[in-house]
């Protein structure tokens, strides 16, 4: 239509959302019904106070047009990435070197884990940061730098945006006992 500076509802329907692509590097989106179409991602998602809360990034749509499901990177995550670009000229994603998934009631019961939420580790890659820190398959990471983790995707997003070579502290459960790296 050739119109600029438009506003849509942009109701937030979920936080910590995944687009469904497990291979994607970022999985902690804000889900909104803002009218985002192919080619106009990158615009701001703002709250009622006019504060930036996210950067519109992706949509789920069979046609490529607005279907009422859009995703935004939270502004605090975007800020971290911008700082890396300023400092290094590129984004350098942190990596633990683990595979895993969300801790759910069935998984907790199967492995005898006394936790309701966290990041379940199914595999630790040899010589990775996780391996060097002593993490093992079956551990459940419950905190990152003293902040509770609710899911594997949250851990993945926070590690990815923490930057390379940064020291972090992980709290985890192993055999019913709490430990820290």
Describe the residue ranges of each PLM region.
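Serine-dependent protease modules
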Residues: 1-133, 143-167, 173-178
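Conserved catalytic motifs of ABC-family nucleotide-binding domains
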Residues: 138
């Amino acid at each position: 239509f050739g119109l600029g500076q438009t506003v849509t509802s942009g109701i937030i329907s979920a936080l910590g959302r995944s687009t469904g692509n497990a291979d994607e590097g970022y999985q902690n989106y804000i889900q909104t019904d803002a009218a985002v179409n192919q080619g106009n991602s990158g615009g701001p998602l703002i709250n009622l106070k006019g504060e930036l809360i996210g950067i519109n990034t992706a949509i789920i749509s069979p046609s490529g047009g607005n279907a009422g499901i859009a995703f935004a990177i939270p502004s605090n995550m975007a800020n971290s990435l911008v700082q890396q670009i300023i400092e290094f000229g590129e984004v350098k994603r942190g990596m633990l070197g683990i595979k895993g998934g969300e801790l759910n009631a069935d998984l907790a019961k199967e492995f005898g884990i006394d936790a309701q939420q966290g990041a379940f580790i199914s595999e630790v890659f040899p010589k990775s940061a996780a391996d060097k820190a002593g993490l093992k398959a079956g551990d459940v990471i419950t905190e990152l730098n003293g902040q509770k983790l609710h899911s594997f995707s949250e851990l993945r997003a926070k590690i990815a945006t923490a930057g390379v070579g940064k020291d972090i502290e992980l709290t985890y459960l192993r055999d019913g006992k709490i430990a820290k790296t």
